[in-house]
A protein has these predicted regions:
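Short coil/turn segments at beta-strand junctions that form active-site/ligand-binding loops
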Residues: 35-37, 61-62
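Short Gly/Thr/Asp-enriched flexible loops that form oxyanion-binding sites at enzyme active sites
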Residues: 49-60
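Short beta->alpha junction loops
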Residues: 10-19
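Short, small-residue-biased leader/transition segments that mark boundaries at the very start
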Residues: 2-6
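Short, glycine-/small-residue-rich phosphate/pyrophosphate-handling segment
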Residues: 80-106
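N-terminal small/polar loop signature for handling phosphorylated ligands or for N-terminal nucleophile
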Residues: 23-35
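Short acidic DE-rich linear segments
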Residues: 111-118
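Short, acidic/small-residue loops that bind anionic groups at enzyme active sites
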Residues: 59-77
Length: 118
């Protein structure tokens, strides 16, 4: 069993939620030291959660906001003991993008490659 080097917190928005997500996020962010690596990962650029998190960046300039969340991205971020450099973060994002694969197309191409080899 591998434990994550960094703590992971999840915030969710519900239709009947009375507390804005920015209030909950601020409460969490206030618990971090200035030198802590903090990554906020959201699902969709331009979505309501991403837009709300964008409003926090002027108050928390050390926070990295990344949209387009997938498991590969979150696991890579959480498994690092130290803050990533900008280049390392860019590589992490590129690797996460590469994990988005149309498996049907992958199988179709593999079958076609086998036919071509005959």
């Amino acid at each position: 069993v591998q434990t994550c080097a960094l703590p992971i917190y999840a915030l969710a928005t519900l239709r009947d939620e009375t507390e804005p997500i920015t209030v909950a996020a601020r409460r969490l962010l206030e618990g971090f030291a200035a030198e802590d690596a903090v990554y906020i990962v959201t699902d969709v650029m331009g979505g309501s959660v991403n837009n709300e998190m964008l409003t926090l960046l002027p108050e928390y300039p050390a926070v990295h906001l990344i949209c387009g969340m997938n498991a590969s991205l979150v696991l890579t971020l959480a498994s690092n003991d130290e803050a990533l450099t900008q280049d390392e973060l860019a590589e992490c994002i590129a690797d996460a993008k590469a994990q988005i694969i149309d498996c049907n197309l992958l199988l179709k191409n593999a079958a076609q490659d086998e036919e071509d080899d005959l």
